[in-house]
């Protein structure tokens, strides 16, 4: 089967941390015999390339100097920087529609798979104008929350995109539920996952030792400020906090830790190697994903870092928000707390750290859940079924 994935951005070089789960999905689809390409935007004039064995076709949309609406940060974040960037989406979409139409006239596909339908549903429409192909649309959640939290004019567009798709897929049950409030169409739920190393030789963490661990970009929706406050609530004899990742909120978080008197117990490690990250997961007493709803209405679509931590048998505590409950069963494979409630978060952390038996039980159950529900074999099988259904029509 010939498949074209349509995305806003895709890795340019090794080490480019852009949609790693999608890269892995495509590599595995190709390994199983499918002919899979990527269609995405250029970055400062970058042309077509082969990335990790994957053919990547890039379209130009503006002058090289300003051709950076994507890749370095999200397009909405970039658009806040200047009037020029707020105008660029028009050029981006127009150029993309013409480019994908030309591309699909030369290269025939069985399935056009659009990720993030706002605005890429327009590129999917243009691709189908070039020749018959099934259209699959994946909704990650942020598009739906834009509609719910201020951008009401997008409601009709998102409904149109869903109705004209042969198959619609959401990455979590929460995203599917929110999308059904906008448009009444059948929606599959297929989570994304990550490549999980074999940890059979890695000892399960000692629950009463090691730091509290967070991994992710330091932005508002990750809720790290509430985690810092929760650690402070655990008192002078509380655990240390290890923060891996970087982002615009780092200076404020460092200042907050100092103001709470725990600067000596909060370690900001920035970016680390894969090997260092794996060691951090394995030695952590508990992993925390304290996500919240940010000012733009965005939150955690799924929370793939939870899968990474659970793979090591590390107990997890996370917010009950977005797609997180699809991964963590409260009281079974982890603990869930109300988003933004640092007191509840502190209580959950204290409970796990003080009870080694609970920590081990949660860790073992989490590890089993990852193996059963989020394996690549299961997810690839689901996508094959969706693609076959899309090519057969309604």
Give the role of each language-model region.
Residues 37-40, 55-60, 134-140, 155-201, ...:
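Donor nucleotide-sugar binding/catalytic pocket of nucleotide-sugar-dependent glycosyltransferases
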Residues 4, 194, 203-231, 242, ...:
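Conserved donor-binding/catalytic core segment of Leloir-type glycosyltransferases
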Residues 1-60:
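N-terminal subdomain of nucleotide-sugar transferases
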């Amino acid at each position: 089967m010939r498949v074209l994935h349509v995305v806003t951005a895709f890795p340019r070089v090794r080490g480019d941390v852009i949609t790693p789960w999608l890269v892995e999905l495509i590599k595995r689809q190709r390994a199983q015999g499918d002919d899979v390409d990527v269609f995405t935007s250029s970055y400062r004039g970058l042309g077509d390339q082969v990335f990790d064995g994957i053919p990547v076709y890039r379209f130009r949309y503006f002058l090289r100097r300003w051709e950076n609406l994507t890749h370095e940060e999200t397009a909405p974040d970039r658009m806040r920087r200047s009037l020029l960037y707020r105008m660029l989406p028009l050029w981006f979409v127009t150029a993309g529609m013409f480019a994908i139409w030309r591309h699909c006239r030369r290269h025939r596909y069985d399935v056009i798979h659009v990720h993030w339908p706002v605005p890429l549903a327009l590129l999917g429409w243009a691709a189908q104008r070039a020749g018959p192909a099934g259209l699959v649309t994946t909704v990650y959640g942020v598009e739906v929350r834009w509609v719910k939290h201020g951008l009401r004019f997008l409601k009709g567009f998102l409904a149109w995109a869903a109705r004209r798709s042969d198959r619609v897929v959401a990455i979590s049950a929460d995203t599917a539920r929110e999308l059904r409030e906008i448009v009444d169409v059948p929606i599959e739920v297929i989570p994304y996952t990550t490549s999980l190393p074999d940890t059979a030789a890695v000892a399960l963490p000692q629950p009463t030792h090691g730091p509290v661990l967070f991994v992710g970009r330091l932005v508002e929706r990750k809720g790290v400020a509430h985690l810092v406050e929760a650690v402070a609530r655990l008192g002078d004899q509380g655990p240390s906090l290890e923060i891996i990742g970087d982002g615009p909120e780092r200076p404020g978080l460092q200042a907050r830790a100092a103001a709470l008197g725990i600067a000596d117990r909060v370690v900001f490690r920035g970016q680390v190697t894969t090997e260092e990250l794996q060691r951090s997961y394995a030695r952590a007493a508990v992993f925390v994903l304290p996500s919240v709803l940010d000012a733009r209405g965005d939150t955690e679509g799924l929370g793939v870092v939870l899968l990474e931590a659970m793979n090591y048998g590390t107990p997890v505590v996370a917010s009950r928000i977005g797609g997180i409950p699809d991964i963590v069963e409260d009281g079974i494979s982890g603990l869930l707390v109300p988003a933004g409630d640092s007191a509840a978060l502190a209580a959950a952390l204290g409970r796990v750290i003080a009870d080694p038996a609970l920590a081990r039980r949660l860790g073992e159950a989490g590890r089993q859940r990852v193996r059963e529900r989020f394996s690549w074999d299961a997810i690839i099988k689901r996508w094959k079924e969706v693609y076959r259904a899309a090519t057969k029509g309604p």
